[in-house]
Amino acid sequence: LKFISKKLINQKDKIIIQELIFKPKISGVIFSSDINNDSPYYIINFDRSGKTNLITSGKKNSSMQTIVIYKETKNLGIFHKLINVIKKFEIIFKDKVLDVEFAVKNNKIYIFQCRNLKKIKINNNDTIKENLINLKKKIIKLKKKNPYLCGETTYFSNMSDWNPAEILGNKPKPLGISLYKELITNSVWAQQRAEYGYKDVRPNHLLINLAGSPYIDLRTDLNSFLPANINQTIQRKLINFFLKNLKRNKSLHDKIEFEVIPTIFDADFEKKIKNTLSINEKIEYKKQLKIITNNILDKKNDILNKEVNKLNKLEKKILQLKKSNLSEIQNIYFLIEECKKNGTLPFAGLARCAFISNSIIKSFVNKNILDEKDKLNFYESFFNISNFINKNLLKIKKGGSKKIFFNKLGHLRPLTYSIESKNYQENFSTYFKDFKFSKNKGRKKFILNNKKEIAINKFFKKNSFKISAKSFFAFAKKSTQLREYSKLIFTKCINEIFINLCSLGKEMNINRKDMEFVTINKLIESYSNLNNSKLKKIFNKEITDNKKNHKILYKIKLPDFIENHKDLYFHKLINVNGNFITNKKIHGKIYEIKLEKKIANLNNKVVLIENADPGYDFIFSHNIKGLITKYGGPNSHMAIRCMELGLPAVIGIGENNYNSLSNSTFLEIDCDLKKVNVIT
């Protein structure tokens, strides 16, 4: 110390020696505001391991937790003393975002350091407070009993069905969320389920907009998976049981069809309902699920071809509208109506068929009728969209025309519901620059041996299913391929809607970026108003209002799963393990794709993406090593795509884990052990 003191330039400088805090109860870092957007929340990253450097080291650990606390809440739980200390720092460093390292031992707070990170730009805390009060009222209202539905209450999830967080993002612009609701979650999803034998829950909407974030109403969702012909007593028992299960196990909210509610009859039926029903009630429930499953699988019903016929009609209608002399607003109106009738409706049906196939195969693996390798070989055995992309890119590389590629895939865009995102045709050189193909792109052979075929046929016969093992796998293959095909067709409609919107915006001197703030509802309302000067006034007002509102809503932080209004003010981020695809082990350098930034060379990288819709399929033309997504379930687009390609992936790793990994450089994915290890 004498040596150090002699080296001090200013003799008034002090050396502060801090006592070593050995094995604290908790330790971590607290931010006085969200560093990304200055939103008024305390964000506490901590763990209970007894180590004081685990959080700051950046290493991922299962003991780590993140708590988000709205600044004006009085419910601070065990953190009230810590928050009071931070508030004293905030008085000293006014309007600054602070990063404070701390530990708690024997009920004492120890501050290791406090760093001033940046100045808070805009303070709109009063408006945020008002929005939270209104949101609280909305949630209390929505949780009350619903005469159309069974269930004493409801909860909200951003990933339980139709994956809105994965497809739209956490805070989508008004155009995207309103278009998604109109095309799918207002009524189309419920119509499709009712047509397949499930309970008709209309007029209830599936997706609820909570402070600009898309959430699925879980009571509505669970009711829509009940067979239409089971009695009210069974319905009530089941829905209340499933809701309680989700409340206890929030991490299951993105995999409810696999882990919570049986939506078809498969080999896993018993484990999902446990002792909820009496013997007779269980028999009735099982019987009705078998009827639904059998009707879908039975060749006589020809469900797959019926859905494809609708898609063929849609393609013809799109071409007709392209050639018409209708105004942009008329085209948009007709495209929306056609897409609902012959686009998203058959897509929903084909997605249900593909899910049923996947669920039955997964249940066979769980019952050891098949093994994991059989499942992976099956999904890697047939031609898919990624194969088509790579095949055509190879032709283009050799000097071939891009016409075939653009005709089939040119309309796709990352973030399907964002007009601001450029499609493959507009941005080909960015998405497919330096494309390289994996050396191992050959399709696997799926061979079902005699013993396994007999076991599967025995299961089908025992449960009176009118299908054989061979016919089932043919159905599974066709339904999976047609689901992907149907995405390609109905997203053409979305692309045409955006083309017409851009053209309309150009006439009105409204740019593409601003068009994100026009709602589809306003466009439909304007169908009868063909005067562009009036439309311009209407749109400009909506754009101004929605921009202002979006800036406020963007700062409101909500959890992935909302149990009640208290979660608006104080919530813990759910630690999820993610859905591991394949049983491979890889390690590689991390590259996070952000569309607002230039995309670098992806070759041999482990790619991180927040969203995971079909428009991101371009990444598979770059010989990537692995994939990690923030959002996504076991049956989501990227999960299926990675399974088809045999690509190691972790789908839906959650906000907490994703943020930790995005700050890392090199990692290892062990799909067999279901682990992600940060190396540097």
Language model segments and positions:
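Core catalytic machinery and nucleic-acid-binding channels of phosphodiester-processing enzymes
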Residues: Q18-F22, K88-F89, T519, L523
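Active-site nucleotide/adenylate-binding loops and adjacent lid/helix of ATP-dependent enzymes
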Residues: L1-K12
